[in-house]
């Protein structure tokens, strides 16, 4: 999100802002939101991954079938891998789908990919295939597949990396 006073991008987006900006999400699934924090993704550390793991476990124990983690793109690949490895550390698999998503462009820009990525992530979390423990299906990352709207890619959470700072594919 852009701070229009300074012109700088800030890490201050509230969950309700995401839902209000994307009302079609509520038509996809029953949504419950938990805010774990607002920070730059490159400030993520192992204790943050533990918090994400705990929140996922709590959500699954409360009956959630899928989870969407909204995350900055700079270190999303580290977090999606950490969560996948965290679940498999004891030879287990998550009881449902865990989807990471974000946006290459600020959510308040007209060219933002945040809405489409979030909608695709919610759809996958709600209706995607059952997690079976195959390599790479414990967590997935869903982002734009090309620079055009209309198609999102579903990628293994342990096999992704950021290729560009603002390009949408």
Task: Write out the residue ranges for each language-model feature.
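Active-site histidine-anchored catalytic micro-motif
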Residues: 1-169
């Amino acid at each position: 999100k852009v701070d229009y006073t300074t012109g700088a991008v800030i890490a201050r987006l509230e969950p309700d802002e995401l839902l209000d900006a994307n009302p079609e999400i509520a038509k996809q699934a029953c949504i419950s939101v938990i805010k774990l924090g607002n920070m730059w993704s490159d400030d993520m550390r192992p204790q943050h991954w533990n918090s994400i793991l705990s929140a996922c476990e709590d959500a699954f124990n409360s009956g959630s079938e899928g989870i969407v983690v909204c995350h900055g793109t700079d270190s999303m690949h580290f977090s999606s891998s950490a969560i996948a490895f965290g679940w498999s550390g004891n030879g287990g698999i998550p009881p449902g789908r865990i989807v990471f998503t974000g946006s290459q462009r600020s959510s308040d820009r007209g060219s933002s990919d945040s809405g489409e990525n979030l909608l695709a992530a919610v759809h996958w979390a709600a209706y995607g295939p059952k997690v079976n423990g195959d390599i790479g299906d414990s967590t997935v990352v869903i982002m734009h597949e090309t620079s055009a709207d209309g198609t999102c890619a579903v990628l293994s959470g342990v096999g992704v990396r950021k290729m560009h700072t603002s390009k949408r594919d």
